[in-house]
Regions:
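Short, Lys/Arg-enriched N-terminal segments with co-localized hydrophobic residues
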Residues: 1-2
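Short N-terminal helix-loop-first-beta-strand/juxtamembrane motif that initiates sensory/input modules
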Residues: 46-68, 91-114, 144
Length: 180
């Protein structure tokens, strides 16, 4: 009887030790995963920031003048740079985004005025309003912001927002890149 009892105790101790080891392994894997994820997120953020700056510099080179928001007779808003309406200039935008494999939107204040994102009917998703979080962080906070869990059209994406400033330092809009 005594021998059997000891064996049961040994098995219990062994099982407990294995459980602790398994738990430690899970925690270590969790931490490693977080570290890998963090560095991946950082790389993704850097990559997206460069793409935003590239796109904005292409616009700057192509259209002299300052960003502005106009309104047509129907009340619809549009994006201007200098004298040019740019929110319907999609040739370059679509080509760049296809090559880089990203989606891009430009917001005037909080409204999406230019985008490569299309709905299920193939129509560009124009006129939608940025989320309250984005308005707070990017427009009001005037800060470039990277989100790792933004949902757009039901797909989770990495999203990077870059505020667009007027010459007097006011935030006029947001340049937004998203990567699936």
């Amino acid at each position: 009887g005594m021998k059997k009892k000891n064996q049961g105790l040994k098995q219990k101790i062994l099982f407990t030790t294995l459980t602790v080891l398994a738990l430690m392994a899970a925690i270590v894997i969790g931490l490693a995963y977080k570290t890998i994820t963090d560095s991946m997120h950082e790389q993704t953020r850097d990559y997206m920031e460069k793409q935003c700056k590239l796109f904005l510099s292409i616009l700057d080179n192509h259209y002299p003048g300052e960003y502005g928001i106009g309104q047509d007779t129907s009340g619809a808003y549009f994006l201007v740079m200098g004298e040019e309406v740019i929110s319907d200039e999609y040739d370059n935008l679509d080509r760049i985004c296809k090559v880089l494999d990203v989606e891009l939107s430009v917001f005037g204040r909080d409204m999406r005025l230019m985008t490569t994102i299309c709905d299920e009917n193939g129509e560009r998703v124009i006129g939608t309003i940025a989320s309250p979080v984005v308005i707070r962080d990017v427009l009001d906070g005037a800060t470039p912001t990277f989100y790792t869990d933004a949902e757009i059209s039901g797909i989770e994406r990495f999203v990077y927002y870059e505020p667009i400033f007027t010459q007097n330092g006011e935030v006029i809009g947001i340049d937004r890149k998203s990567v699936v």
